[in-house]
């Protein structure tokens, strides 16, 4: 297969924009409160030799294997691997409609998020099910025809990190999440890649981590020749 270098990263992060005087007051409130009341992160670091820590993997049946009936006869091109980084699914006690809808009760959401840990526990079945039955099912699965799909579970930053992205706590949360992605990718390179072309796919928070991954592993390195697109 001809290897094509096509570096085009689209980042769509679910940030909430706060405007006007009320927005500024809320922003100051968030910076004071979201950073000081969170409980410590819990849960183990992922062990990527264990299939539990992969939301999608060619070695188990998962929601990325879902294929529409009219495409079931299509053959996969096994010459390419897809490394997929899913978006934020760790919302804590918040309700998605309150977060995303203009008429949502934002202050109630903020109060619910104050005590939430900054990073997800990988044993949290609510978070895992949300990732599996949304992003992995409806996004990662579109790459079925391209080749094998690898999507690591990672200790993603809570949605509140996007409310105060400049805070030290949010930065630490994103760094921890990226460290898991990095370790997963290193495991994939060591045990699975074997010189295959690679597609890096991502969405929202996943794209933040994908950018760092591309910069660290592909920019100006021999691995860049294996990158099909990102």
Can you describe what each PLM-predicted range is?
Residues 222-229:
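A conserved short beta-strand
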Residues 1-22:
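Bacterial Sec-dependent N-terminal signal peptides
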Residues 21-124, 129:
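N-terminal low-complexity, Ser/Thr- and acidic-residue-enriched intrinsically disordered segments
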Residues 37, 84-196:
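Active-site catalytic motif of lipid deacylating hydrolases and related acyltransferases
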Residues 210-218:
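Short glycine-enriched nucleophile-adjacent loop
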Residues 72-76, 140-143, 220-222:
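A general structural signal for short secondary-structure junctions and capping/turn motifs
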Residues 202, 206:
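Gly/Ala-rich beta-loop-alpha elbow adjacent to hydrolase catalytic centers
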């Amino acid at each position: 297969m001809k290897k094509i270098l096509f570096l085009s990263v689209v980042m769509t992060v679910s940030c909430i924009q706060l405007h006007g005087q009320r927005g500024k007051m809320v922003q100051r409130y968030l910076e004071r409160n979201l950073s000081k009341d969170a409980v410590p992160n819990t849960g183990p670091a992922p062990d990527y030799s264990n299939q539990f820590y992969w939301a999608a993997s060619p070695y188990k049946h998962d929601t990325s294997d879902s294929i529409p009936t009219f495409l079931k006869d299509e053959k996969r091109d096994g010459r390419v691997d897809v490394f997929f980084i899913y978006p934020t699914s760790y919302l804590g006690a918040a309700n998605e409609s309150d977060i995303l809808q203009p008429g949502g009760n934002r202050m109630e959401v903020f109060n619910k998020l104050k005590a939430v840990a900054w990073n997800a526990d990988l044993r949290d079945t609510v978070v895992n099910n949300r990732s599996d039955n949304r992003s992995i099912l409806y996004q990662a699965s579109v790459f079925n025809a391209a080749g094998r799909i690898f999507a690591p579970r990672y200790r993603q930053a809570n949605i509140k990190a996007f409310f105060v992205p400049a805070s030290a706590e949010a930065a630490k949360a994103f760094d921890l999440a990226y460290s898991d992605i990095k370790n997963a990718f290193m495991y994939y390179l060591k045990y699975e890649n074997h010189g295959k072309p690679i597609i890096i796919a991502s969405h929202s928070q996943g794209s933040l981590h994908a950018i760092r991954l591309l910069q660290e592993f592909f920019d100006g390195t021999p691995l860049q020749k294996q990158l099909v697109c990102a």
